[in-house]
Structures are given as C-alpha cells and as structure tokens.
C-alpha cells in the first residue's frame, strides 16, 4: 500500500513538496470521482489542509525550517482517518448559525460538496481498502534503492481504482527520479563528481500491454512525460511486452493510438523480437519510419533469441541474445 495522504520529500523546499503533493491529490480525486468539478476540488483541498493542520503535520503557512515530509509513515492520516475528519467537519458546519439566506445557501452548498467527497472515499474504503486505505508499507520509501510494485491484477479492477493505483505508483517513481536526478545533475555540472559516479535511476515495467490502452489514459500520459523527461535527470524507462497487438487493440480511439505512437517515438532504443506476420501493420503504426520495409518483413521470420534493435538517429542492428543454462534456470516466466 502507498498512502495517498503521505507527503513525500520531492524537493529540498518543503513548500514545494506540499504544492506537488496537493497537485497529485487533485488528480487522484478527479480519477476517483470520475468527473472534473472545480468547486469540489477546492472543498477537497480545503478539508485536506485543515486535517493536516489539526494533526500538526502542516502549519497554516509553511516557513523555511518547517518539516512536513519527515514524519514516520504511521503518522500521516489514511483514507479512514480522512473519512472521520470529513464527517466531523460536516457536523461542525451544521452547528453554525448563518446570519443571512445567502450565508445559509453557501453552507448548504459546502455540505453537499463534502457529502459527495465523503461518499467517494467511503466507497473506496469499503470496496478497495486493501489497495488504498492504510499507511505506506515501506518507511522512508524515497530512500530505498530498489522497490518492486506488484500490479499483476490491476487490470481486473474498475478503471477509477486501477488508474489511481497506477498514478500513485508512477508518481512515486517520477518524483524519486527527479529528486535524485537534480542532485546528481548539480554535482556533475559543478564538476564535483564524474559521470561514472552519477547515481542513475531506472524504472522497468514488465507486461506493459496490460495498461497500454485507452482504459489508462492518466498512466499513458505519465509514461510519455517520463520517457521524454527522465533522460534529463539521469533516468531511464524500460517497457516490455511480448505482443504489439495488445498495445494497440481493435477499436482503439485515435487519441489513444496517438499517445502510444508518441510514447514509442520518445524511446531511443527499441528491441523487436518475432511477431506474427498479421501484426506487421500494427508495428508500422507504432514504429513508423524507424524501421525499413525490409526490416518489417524480416520480423515474422526472426528466430528464437534474435532481435532487431532500432536506434533513434542511427542505423538498426539485428543481433542474437545468448543465454547461459544458469540464466535459463533463473528464469521463472514460463516453460
């Protein structure tokens, strides 16, 4: 579990950390509510800030020296805590005595918005709490060198839940890459470390076809942004799938196909193994002119272990991967 209400250290400036955190919560709320309601988002941000202040996590105005990201994972509120706080706030509003009809209507509108927020998070807690309601499983998650996220069954969940989980997961990766990369970039550009001493950041995403479709527009956009920007901060993204057909399923919208094409276009290195001859048109849709007509015809005839490496801005190479018996024995992906 990653707690959506935990504030991560993505910058040395705690104020920036909070702004980034609230910005991500805005996206999470829009995904969970399955609509864009600016007034509800304002009410959501307001109640979240009040909760943090009452818990002495965030001051009313963040000043230099304040620390809002250094609490233990268990000290940040969870979805269940947030639900209790919203209920409390609703009751407090109901106790207020408006001095005019206009003020009364404002309070009624606020209660309606908070009721909507409450229903959304109660549904998440009751039906999908094991995925989203709880403290972050790993303390100091931004300081761990290697993390594996198991999202094996994510495609079986409703889209608003799976998109939320994916957004949280990718945001952690992207924030961690940026935080580490900016430190490394500064040290390298100031001549304090050599390129060999730079700590790089790598995100590997296996079974990528499970989310590379229109059901996960938020994830697709994030992947595209990461693929375009990570190289600037010593980061890289590896995406692996065994079938191009599942990346571009039938009846895909023009927008989702364009997103996938954009994602591939930002990939400097593309390793292509054998694909069925019937899939060549989809390969052409995805890779365009990065392969020649002869190479497209060659793909269905590649032997086991043979790949075509397409290098952006350079020539393509066909090569064979040699695997030792020891490495085959380590592999548990299938017989």
Go through each PLM region and give its residues.
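P-loop NTPase motor domains
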Residues: 2-235, 307-311
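Short helix/loop capping segments that flank catalytic or ligand/cofactor-binding pockets
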Residues: 157-159, 213, 281, 318-320, ...
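Short, solvent-exposed amphipathic alpha-helical segments in soluble enzyme
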Residues: 164-168, 287-288, 326
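C-terminal alpha-helical "lid" subdomain
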Residues: 322-335
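Conserved ATP-driven motor cores of ASCE-family P-loop NTPases powering translocation/secretion/packaging/pilus
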Residues: 3-35, 218-322
